[in-house]
Amino acid sequence: MILVNNPGSWAHIYWPLEHAPWNGWTPTDLIFPFFLFIVGVAMMFSFASRTALGATRAQLAWHVLWRSLIIFAIGLFLNGFPYFHWSRMRIPGVLQRIAVCYLVAALAVLAARRPADRSGRTGQRIAPVVVVTLVLLVGYWAAMTFIPVPGYGVGRLDPDGNLGAYIDRRVMGAHLWVQSKTWDPEGIMSTFPAIATVLIGVLVGEWLRSPRVPSGHGSRAARVKTAGLLAAGAAGLVVGELLHPFFPINKNLWTSSYVVFTGGFAMVLLGLCYWLIDVKGYRRWATPFLVYGTNSIFIFALSGLLAKASVIFKVTGPDSRGVTWHSYVYDKFFVPLASPINASLLFAIFYILLWLFLTWLLYRKHIFIKI
C-alpha cells in the first residue's frame, strides 16, 4: 500500500497502481483483502502458541480487545493529524477496519472453541465459523439487494444510492472520507463482509494446523497443502466470477463476490508462496516482504504520517513561493529524471526503499514493535 498511496503525482499513475473506479478490480484492489486474509491465518497460529503457553480464552480475548483498541486509535490519530477538527474528522479508515474485523473475527473464533478437556487441551469448532462466514456474505447480499433506500429505491449499487452509503450518511454525517463526501470505502455496512475475509483466513489457518493435514515440509505434506490451497483458491476465483453478474466484484462496497474472489486469489498466492519458500527453499526473494512484515502496522502508520505531513507543511520554492515538501522533492529530484508517469513511479519506489531501509535497521537490531 505504501507504493500505491505515495505516487509523485496523482495525475500520473500506471493503471495497476490505481483502484478500479467502481465495479471490477485491479492488482491494487487485492492488497487490503490479502492483508485481512493473512490476519485470519496468522490468528490461528498465534492463538495456538499462546494457548500452549497457558493463556486462557479470557486472556486471549483481553489481548485481542486491547490490540484492537490501539490499532483503532492509531487510525483515528492518522485521520485527524495535524489539525484534529473533531467536527468533521473522518471516523472510518484502513486501520479502523483492520481493528474491527480482527476483533469480531477473533471473538467469534474464541466463542467457537471447545472447552479444555482433562488434559487441558482445547480444540476449534469449524462449523460455527463457517456458518458465521456464510451468514455475513449472504446477509450482506440480501440487505444490499432487497432493503429499500429512502429517496433511491431498492437494489441500487451506485456510490450514493446503495444501502451502505445511506447508513454511513445517517450515522456518521460529515465524518466520512473527504474525497467521496457521501459514502466511505471503509464504511459501516461493508465492514461486515470484510469480517468474512478474515474468517476465510481463519478457516485456512485452521486447516493448515489440522492433524488431518500432514505436518512438516515432506513431499506428501507439501503436495497436500499446496494442492489444497490451489484447488480451494481456484474454486474461490471461479465462484467469485460467477457471482459477479448478480452482485458485482467491488472493493468499495466489499461485495460478497469480492470476498470470495479475493479469498480465492489469496489462497492461490499463499499456496505458491508455501511451495516456493517452505518446500523449494527459495527464500531470498521474499526477504524484503519478511522485513516489512515484522513491523507492518507500525511502518504503515509512520509512512502515512510522514506522507500526510509532506503535503501539508511547506518550504520556499525556487520562485520564493511556498510549496509542499512533497512537491518540492518530486519536482526537484524526480521530474527531471523521466517522463511524468515514470517520475511519479520512481518517487513511490524511493519512498518504499526509504521505509524498507528503516525497517531493515529495526529488523537487524531485533526491534519488533508489537501492537
Which residues make up each language-model segment?
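Membrane-interface helix-loop-helix modules in multi-pass inner-membrane proteins
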Residues: 47-111
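N-terminal signal-anchor module of multipass membrane proteins
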Residues: 1-60, 296, 302-303, 313, ...
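Functional transmembrane helices that form membrane-embedded active or gating regions
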Residues: 227-235, 256, 279-303, 370-371
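A conserved active-site cap/scaffold subdomain adjacent to cofactor or substrate pockets
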Residues: 183-211, 219-239
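Membrane-interface helix caps and helix-loop-helix hairpins in membrane proteins
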Residues: 82-92, 245-256
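Kinked, hydrophobic transmembrane alpha-helices enriched for aromatic residues
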Residues: 1-11, 70-82, 239-243, 293-314
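Extracytosolic (periplasmic/ER-lumenal) interhelical loops and adjacent juxtamembrane/interface segments
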Residues: 8-25, 145-187, 314-343
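Membrane-interface transmembrane-helix boundary segments in multi-pass integral membrane proteins
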Residues: 25, 184-194, 251-263, 267, ...
